[in-house]
Amino acid sequence: MADDWESAADSEIVIRPNATNNINKWEGEDDDEDVKESWEDEEEKKDEEKPTKTEAPVKTKPNKALKAKLEEQERLNEEEERKRLANMTAEEKLAEKLRLQKIQEESDLKSALDTFGVTSIGGGLDAFNPQSKEEFKEFGATLSWKVAQYRESVHFPEFIEDLVRSLCVNLSAADIKKVKMSVESLHSEKQKMEKANAKKSAAKAKGKVSLRKESDDIDDYQKYGNDFTDDYDDFM
Protein backbone atom coordinates (compact mmCIF):
# COMPACT_ATOMS: atom_id res chain seq x y z
CA MET A 1 0.00 0.00 0.00
CA ALA A 2 2.78 2.32 0.83
CA ASP A 3 4.42 1.46 -2.40
CA ASP A 4 1.29 2.40 -4.27
CA TRP A 5 1.18 5.85 -2.68
CA GLU A 6 4.81 6.44 -3.47
CA SER A 7 4.26 5.37 -7.04
CA ALA A 8 1.29 7.72 -7.34
CA ALA A 9 3.24 10.57 -5.81
CA ASP A 10 6.09 9.97 -8.15
CA SER A 11 3.77 9.88 -11.11
CA GLU A 12 2.20 13.23 -10.16
CA ILE A 13 5.49 14.98 -9.91
CA VAL A 14 5.87 17.21 -13.00
CA ILE A 15 9.16 18.83 -13.67
CA ARG A 16 8.47 22.33 -14.98
CA PRO A 17 11.15 24.49 -16.51
CA ASN A 18 12.34 27.48 -14.54
CA ALA A 19 10.39 30.60 -15.46
CA THR A 20 13.51 32.61 -15.33
CA ASN A 21 14.93 30.59 -18.16
CA ASN A 22 12.08 31.51 -20.55
CA ILE A 23 13.26 33.48 -23.54
CA ASN A 24 11.10 36.51 -24.30
CA LYS A 25 10.50 36.58 -28.01
CA TRP A 26 10.01 40.39 -27.88
CA GLU A 27 13.29 40.89 -26.17
CA GLY A 28 15.68 43.12 -28.15
CA GLU A 29 13.02 44.82 -30.27
CA ASP A 30 13.16 47.96 -28.11
CA ASP A 31 16.89 48.13 -28.74
CA ASP A 32 16.27 47.89 -32.47
CA GLU A 33 13.78 50.75 -32.28
CA ASP A 34 16.27 52.92 -30.34
CA VAL A 35 18.93 52.27 -32.97
CA LYS A 36 16.49 53.13 -35.75
CA GLU A 37 15.42 56.38 -34.08
CA SER A 38 19.02 57.45 -33.48
CA TRP A 39 19.84 56.75 -37.13
CA GLU A 40 16.88 58.83 -38.29
CA ASP A 41 18.00 61.67 -36.01
CA GLU A 42 21.47 61.58 -37.54
CA GLU A 43 20.00 61.70 -41.05
CA GLU A 44 17.89 64.71 -40.10
CA LYS A 45 20.94 66.47 -38.67
CA LYS A 46 22.87 65.80 -41.87
CA ASP A 47 20.02 67.24 -43.91
CA GLU A 48 19.97 70.34 -41.71
CA GLU A 49 23.72 70.78 -41.96
CA LYS A 50 23.67 70.69 -45.76
CA PRO A 51 24.15 74.24 -47.11
CA THR A 52 21.12 75.59 -48.87
CA LYS A 53 21.77 76.58 -52.43
CA THR A 54 20.57 80.07 -53.32
CA GLU A 55 19.41 80.44 -56.86
CA ALA A 56 21.01 83.36 -58.65
CA PRO A 57 18.48 85.83 -60.08
CA VAL A 58 17.93 85.42 -63.75
CA LYS A 59 19.21 88.47 -65.61
CA THR A 60 16.78 89.62 -68.22
CA LYS A 61 18.46 90.74 -71.38
CA PRO A 62 17.21 94.04 -72.79
CA ASN A 63 14.99 93.62 -75.76
CA LYS A 64 16.99 95.36 -78.48
CA ALA A 65 14.20 95.05 -80.99
CA LEU A 66 11.72 96.78 -78.68
CA LYS A 67 14.22 99.55 -77.86
CA ALA A 68 14.90 100.17 -81.54
CA LYS A 69 11.17 100.27 -82.25
CA LEU A 70 10.57 102.86 -79.53
CA GLU A 71 13.42 105.04 -80.79
CA GLU A 72 12.06 104.84 -84.33
CA GLN A 73 8.58 105.80 -83.13
CA GLU A 74 10.00 108.78 -81.25
CA ARG A 75 11.89 109.91 -84.34
CA LEU A 76 8.76 109.66 -86.47
CA ASN A 77 6.78 111.69 -83.94
CA GLU A 78 9.40 114.45 -83.95
CA GLU A 79 9.46 114.50 -87.74
CA GLU A 80 5.67 114.69 -87.88
CA GLU A 81 5.70 117.59 -85.40
CA ARG A 82 8.24 119.48 -87.53
CA LYS A 83 6.09 119.00 -90.62
CA ARG A 84 3.01 120.20 -88.74
CA LEU A 85 4.77 123.37 -87.61
CA ALA A 86 6.13 124.00 -91.11
CA ASN A 87 2.65 123.81 -92.67
CA MET A 88 1.07 126.19 -90.15
CA THR A 89 -0.33 129.55 -91.16
CA ALA A 90 0.71 132.74 -89.39
CA GLU A 91 -2.44 132.65 -87.24
CA GLU A 92 -1.86 129.01 -86.30
CA LYS A 93 1.76 129.71 -85.41
CA LEU A 94 0.67 132.59 -83.18
CA ALA A 95 -1.90 130.37 -81.48
CA GLU A 96 0.73 127.69 -80.95
CA LYS A 97 3.13 130.26 -79.52
CA LEU A 98 0.47 131.45 -77.08
CA ARG A 99 -0.29 127.87 -76.10
CA LEU A 100 3.36 127.14 -75.36
CA GLN A 101 3.64 130.43 -73.49
CA LYS A 102 0.67 129.45 -71.33
CA ILE A 103 2.29 126.10 -70.56
CA GLN A 104 5.50 127.90 -69.59
CA GLU A 105 3.58 130.30 -67.36
CA GLU A 106 1.84 127.39 -65.64
CA SER A 107 5.23 125.78 -65.10
CA ASP A 108 6.57 129.04 -63.66
CA LEU A 109 3.55 129.25 -61.39
CA LYS A 110 4.18 125.74 -60.11
CA SER A 111 7.80 126.64 -59.39
CA ALA A 112 6.70 129.77 -57.56
CA LEU A 113 4.21 127.82 -55.48
CA ASP A 114 6.87 125.25 -54.65
CA THR A 115 9.18 128.07 -53.58
CA PHE A 116 6.53 129.43 -51.21
CA GLY A 117 5.77 125.92 -50.00
CA VAL A 118 2.17 125.90 -51.19
CA THR A 119 0.19 123.20 -52.93
CA SER A 120 -1.44 123.16 -56.35
CA ILE A 121 -3.95 125.89 -57.14
CA GLY A 122 -6.56 123.40 -58.33
CA GLY A 123 -9.40 125.20 -60.10
CA GLY A 124 -7.82 128.68 -60.09
CA LEU A 125 -8.60 131.76 -58.01
CA ASP A 126 -12.32 131.01 -57.89
CA ALA A 127 -11.57 127.67 -56.24
CA PHE A 128 -9.92 129.32 -53.23
CA ASN A 129 -11.71 129.72 -49.94
CA PRO A 130 -8.81 130.47 -47.57
CA GLN A 131 -9.37 129.97 -43.86
CA SER A 132 -6.00 129.22 -42.30
CA LYS A 133 -2.76 131.19 -42.49
CA GLU A 134 -1.26 128.71 -44.94
CA GLU A 135 -4.31 128.89 -47.18
CA PHE A 136 -4.12 132.70 -47.28
CA LYS A 137 -0.41 132.38 -48.08
CA GLU A 138 -1.22 130.10 -50.99
CA PHE A 139 -4.00 132.41 -52.18
CA GLY A 140 -1.68 135.43 -52.00
CA ALA A 141 1.06 133.69 -54.01
CA THR A 142 -1.42 132.75 -56.73
CA LEU A 143 -3.00 136.21 -56.83
CA SER A 144 0.40 137.91 -56.94
CA TRP A 145 1.52 135.71 -59.83
CA LYS A 146 -1.69 136.42 -61.73
CA VAL A 147 -1.40 140.18 -61.30
CA ALA A 148 2.32 140.22 -62.14
CA GLN A 149 1.56 138.98 -65.66
CA TYR A 150 0.52 142.54 -66.58
CA ARG A 151 3.57 144.30 -65.12
CA GLU A 152 4.77 145.43 -68.57
CA SER A 153 1.69 147.59 -69.10
CA VAL A 154 2.01 151.35 -68.66
CA HIS A 155 -1.14 151.24 -66.53
CA PHE A 156 0.30 148.68 -64.12
CA PRO A 157 1.71 151.13 -61.48
CA GLU A 158 -1.56 153.05 -61.25
CA PHE A 159 -3.47 149.79 -61.08
CA ILE A 160 -1.34 148.58 -58.15
CA GLU A 161 -1.80 151.89 -56.34
CA ASP A 162 -5.57 151.68 -56.66
CA LEU A 163 -5.56 148.02 -55.71
CA VAL A 164 -3.54 148.57 -52.54
CA ARG A 165 -5.73 151.52 -51.57
CA SER A 166 -8.95 149.57 -52.07
CA LEU A 167 -7.59 146.64 -50.08
CA CYS A 168 -6.34 148.79 -47.22
CA VAL A 169 -9.78 150.35 -46.78
CA ASN A 170 -10.80 147.15 -45.02
CA LEU A 171 -7.89 147.36 -42.54
CA SER A 172 -7.54 149.14 -39.24
CA ALA A 173 -5.14 152.06 -38.77
CA ALA A 174 -2.64 149.80 -36.99
CA ASP A 175 -2.71 147.27 -39.81
CA ILE A 176 -2.35 150.00 -42.43
CA LYS A 177 0.72 151.25 -40.56
CA LYS A 178 2.26 147.76 -40.83
CA VAL A 179 1.58 147.74 -44.56
CA LYS A 180 3.10 151.22 -44.85
CA MET A 181 6.28 150.16 -43.03
CA SER A 182 6.60 147.09 -45.22
CA VAL A 183 6.19 149.14 -48.41
CA GLU A 184 8.66 151.78 -47.19
CA SER A 185 11.23 149.09 -46.45
CA LEU A 186 10.75 147.71 -49.95
CA HIS A 187 11.04 151.24 -51.36
CA SER A 188 14.37 151.76 -49.60
CA GLU A 189 15.75 148.49 -50.96
CA LYS A 190 14.62 149.37 -54.47
CA GLN A 191 16.34 152.76 -54.28
CA LYS A 192 19.63 151.17 -53.27
CA MET A 193 19.44 148.70 -56.14
CA GLU A 194 18.61 151.37 -58.72
CA LYS A 195 21.46 153.64 -57.54
CA ALA A 196 23.93 150.77 -57.70
CA ASN A 197 22.79 149.89 -61.23
CA ALA A 198 23.06 153.55 -62.30
CA LYS A 199 26.65 153.75 -61.04
CA LYS A 200 27.58 150.61 -62.95
CA SER A 201 26.06 152.00 -66.15
CA ALA A 202 27.93 155.31 -65.74
CA ALA A 203 31.23 153.52 -65.16
CA LYS A 204 30.76 151.49 -68.31
CA ALA A 205 29.97 154.63 -70.32
CA LYS A 206 33.16 156.38 -69.13
CA GLY A 207 35.25 153.39 -70.02
CA LYS A 208 34.36 153.62 -73.69
CA VAL A 209 37.04 155.38 -75.77
CA SER A 210 36.13 156.92 -79.12
CA LEU A 211 38.64 156.18 -81.89
CA ARG A 212 39.39 158.67 -84.63
CA LYS A 213 40.95 157.91 -87.99
CA GLU A 214 43.11 160.20 -90.12
CA SER A 215 40.28 160.50 -92.58
CA ASP A 216 38.18 162.08 -89.83
CA ASP A 217 40.53 165.11 -89.77
CA ILE A 218 40.18 165.53 -93.53
CA ASP A 219 36.42 165.37 -93.17
CA ASP A 220 36.58 168.13 -90.57
CA TYR A 221 38.57 170.37 -92.92
CA GLN A 222 36.09 169.73 -95.69
CA LYS A 223 33.24 170.78 -93.42
CA TYR A 224 34.86 174.17 -92.99
CA GLY A 225 35.48 174.68 -96.73
CA ASN A 226 39.06 173.42 -96.86
CA ASP A 227 38.49 170.95 -99.62
CA PHE A 228 41.95 169.98 -100.83
CA THR A 229 40.50 167.72 -103.47
CA ASP A 230 38.74 170.56 -105.26
CA ASP A 231 41.93 172.67 -105.28
CA TYR A 232 43.83 169.83 -106.82
CA ASP A 233 41.20 169.40 -109.51
CA ASP A 234 41.32 173.14 -110.33
CA PHE A 235 45.08 173.02 -110.64
CA MET A 236 44.85 170.15 -113.08
Curated annotation (Swiss-Prot):
GO-annotated cellular components: eukaryotic 43S preinitiation complex; eukaryotic 48S preinitiation complex; eukaryotic translation initiation factor 3 complex
Bias type Basic and acidic residues, positions: 47-58, 68-88, 188-197
GO MF: translation initiation factor activity
Segments of skewed composition (Basic residues): 201-210
Coiled coil segments of this chain: 61-112, 174-209
GO process terms (BP): formation of cytoplasmic translation initiation complex; regulation of translational initiation
Start-end of Acidic residues biased regions: 28-46
Domain of life: Eukaryota
One Pfam family this sequence matches: eIF3_subunit
Keyword Protein biosynthesis: yes
Region (Disordered) residue spans: 1-88, 188-236
Keyword NAD: no
UniProt similarity note: Belongs to the eIF-3 subunit J family.
Quaternary structure note: Component of the eukaryotic translation initiation factor 3 (eIF-3) complex. The eIF-3 complex interacts with pix.
Protein name in UniProt: Eukaryotic translation initiation factor 3 subunit J
Species of origin: Drosophila virilis
